[in-house]
Amino acid sequence: MSILLQIRDITKRFGGLQALTRVSFDLSQGEILGLIGPNGAGKTTLFNTINGVYRPDEGRIIFRGQDITGKKPYHLAKMGMARTHQIVRPLNDLTVRENVMVGACFGHENRSLHQAREIADQVLAFVGLEGRADQLAGSLNVAQKKRLEMARALAARPHLLLLDEVLAGLNPAEIDGMVQTILKIREQGITILMIEHVMKAIMNVSDRIIVLDYGQLIAAGTPQEIAHNQRVIEAYLGDPRIAEQLMEEQVYHERSGNP
């Protein structure tokens, strides 16, 4: 399996605050890689550094064999990188279809409106919003706005999709539906790096998981390995709810006979 994304010794500072310290990992083509960590661990900062919102102070980012360190988001969109955002902000006064057409054109200036509309309709059907295409985006509920955010990113036809807490604020049925959509995205050949706090979901959907704490990579491995990792559990002890979820995962894997 070929390497799609290489993160090498990424360090990011904001004044006297060191948000990331020498973070390194690889992401293989077709993989779903989960990124977890306590609040304030540096997860979204890492996303913003990967997709060009921030330039790292040190380190290199290699995407599809090219050094993209410091490149702007629209350049990366043209190369095949797209992302969603933790706080969903659709263009409320545009229709759902028009929002997705914007995503289809970002970084792809040569696409015609006709092409953008065709892509938008295909993607809306894929995420289950085809019946909402002519509604104003501002009229959607939270779960629908999450799907719209994902549709805008998919409309760019990415090789790599960065998902920032797409499950936050969803009920259990909506989470299950979104997880199925994420798996369908991978079936399309799209590689996924996702930040998530819904532990059971990310444990079930990820091939591997990496863990940040205070801006440092403290663990990497399969979901089973992460659920058993004492350092990861200790990092989450400041959030008893998530620490409990991790320990529940550990008990589940022990009872099921998984390593």
Residue locations for each model-derived region?
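Glycine-rich phosphate-binding loops of nucleotide-dependent enzymes
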Residues: 2-259
